[in-house]
Amino acid sequence: MLYKVSDLFDLTHTRAAELLEKCEYPHEVLPRIKPFILALGETLPISEFLHPSPTVWIARDAVVAPTACLGECIIIDHGAEVRHCAYIRGSALIGRDAVVGNSTELKNVILFDNVQVPHYNYVGDSVLGYRAHMGAGAVTSNVKGDRQPVVVHRGSERMETGLKKLGAMLGDYAEIGCGAVLNPGAVIGRGAQVYPLVSVRGTVPANCIHKGGSVVEKREGGTRRRGGYGTFLEPKKVPKKAVCDVKVNWIKTGSGPGHPRGREELESLGLE
């Protein structure tokens, strides 16, 4: 099944909850972002938000670098950080404690709380869920080369969106590696990971890893650098003596981690 809003996002971590609740599929929110921000901005208390221009609202405890460029129709929430030379073109709702880094460009987006797009990212016509992170240089491509409307698909399922501009939908805790390209209409499930330099089309299922040539499920016992979605177990603890015994055996037998016997010994300890 194609991912719905409820499959990707915990709506307690965004001011756009009311808007997203009205949408079954996440891409349906994109044409509604601008009017929603304008209406929401008028309700924000002046005791908490600065109002430097008619359509821009910035939380008083947010940090916006003097070299950042802000367009129109923008809300920057509490604790967010917009770093030097960031370019927020417009229609952007930036959540609490989010990070928008140097030379990052945003356009028609919702960033949930704690999202990080910290270095040289382009995020357009997209929604990034709670604690989603994009590595340096990772981008969302939001227009097809033939300029035709974008189709969202997962396996054999397809949905015509009617949108000529549609970037990516990142579920909560999605992790995108450096230099990755998320092609128009890409959907990254909750807790999913995309390796660096990978070009993603279609949908990456929740709690899976897109390695480029293959998509695999995350293993129990794996770790994540940042807080995770679902059940992620702590790494298996292996007695130091057991590891030392394996290494001594490698020396005696001339094997090692690249040798079939060596790999078997590592697997017996629950390691690779």
Residue ranges, per PLM feature:
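Short gly/ser/thr-rich secondary-structure transition/capping motifs
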Residues: 44-48, 61, 157-159
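Hydrophobic, well-structured mid-protein blocks that either form specific transmembrane helices
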Residues: 94-114, 118
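Terminal amphipathic alpha-helical/low-complexity segments used for targeting or macromolecular assembly
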Residues: 1-55, 191, 197, 206-208, ...
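ABC ATPase A-loop
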Residues: 57, 75, 93, 169, ...
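Glycine-rich hexapeptide-repeat left-handed beta-helix
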Residues: 17-18, 111-113, 118-235, 244
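Pentapeptide-repeat beta-helix register
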Residues: 73-74, 80, 91, 104, ...
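Glycine-rich active-site/cofactor-binding loop and its immediate structural neighborhood
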Residues: 60-103
